[in-house]
A protein has these predicted regions:
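A short glycine-rich, Lys/Arg-flanked "PGG" loop and its adjoining helix->strand segment in the class I
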Residues: 148-160
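Acceptor-substrate binding/catalytic loop of class I
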Residues: 203-219
């Protein structure tokens, strides 16, 4: 495991360092907010705005991995993009998060009643036993100590032979990600910042020292095994998201679309989506 620091280019015209721990509001803002907006007018407008890109990848994987007639708990559901797609396809999904989002009541008007629980997976345990539990793009924020708590509590809430699906929430900790994220992106950010001063542009960046953690595949498997899970398989998807953290790469793809295939090939070394499937033993 290694600390994952993120750089975000913005229009602040300064370099900002962020060290504070994140709360539910921070995560909500990172995901675009959970408030009701103009896209809550209908199911169609909701899905057209929110359900695309990696959300489609996640939903397709979940549909192929979960029996719709079994009971499934979603950890950190947010505004329920994947969950509502599954519910619309007759899956039995119970949502949960640190707080129930403000948009919950409005979503029930669109999609009908569905359960949403206030749940801190690091502290709380539900008395209900589930056939499946899944967690999408969450475990990257957990320290080793918190990841242990996560596996312990999930194990208690799963039936015997129950399935845990875990998305890592970012590329693997390897040499490629180290050179790209910890070296190249930092150099690129400083170059853009100082060049913006020469050309009198208001460009700055935020250096988030508390973004999360990166882990090797074998580290996640080791944690799961330690706390009573058998590894079934891993599927990897989305080979561009990590690389597109670079402004230069985004511009190259924009102006030279044929280059996308090259970057997809390179991105296979740091896939953004890593779907782990485990069974409780």
């Amino acid at each position: 495991m290694k600390k994952w620091n993120q750089i975000i280019i913005d229009r602040s015209n300064k370099i900002t360092k962020v060290n504070k721990p994140k709360n539910f509001k921070d995560f909500s803002e990172e995901m675009g907010g959970y408030d009701v907006n103009e896209y809550f007018k209908s199911k169609k407008s909701f899905f057209e705005f929110y359900f695309h890109g990696r959300y489609v990848i996640w939903s397709n994987y979940l549909k192929s991995s979960i029996n719709p007639f079994t009971k499934t708990l979603s950890i950190a559901s947010g505004n329920g993009i994947n969950e509502l797609d599954l519910i619309s396809n007759n899956f039995n999904i119970i949502c949960s998060d640190l707080e129930i989002p403000q948009c919950y009541e409005e979503l029930k008007k669109l999609f009908g009643h569905f359960d949403y629980l206030k749940l801190n997976i690091l502290k709380d345990i539900i008395s209900i036993e589930f056939d499946n539990i899944y967690s999408i793009s969450v475990c990257y924020i957990f320290s080793d100590q918190n990841l242990e708590k996560f596996f312990i509590n999930v194990h208690k809430m799963l039936k015997k032979n129950g399935i845990l699906i875990l998305d890592s929430g970012g590329g693997e900790d390897n040499l490629t990600s180290f050179f790209f994220i910890d070296i190249y992106l930092v150099i690129e950010a400083y170059l853009i910042y100082y060049l913006s001063k020469i050309f009198n542009k208001k460009i700055g960046f935020k250096f988030d020292n508390n973004f999360g953690y990166k882990r090797k595949n074998r580290e996640i498997k080791k944690f799961a095994k330690k706390f009573g899970f058998e590894f079934i398989d891993i599927k990897e998807y989305d080979y561009l998201t990590e690389l597109q953290r670079s402004i230069l790469i985004r511009k190259i793809i924009e102006y030279f679309p044929f280059s996308k295939k090259v970057f997809v090939s390179l991105g296979k070394m740091i896939p953004y989506i890593r779907m782990f499937k485990f069974k409780k033993i």
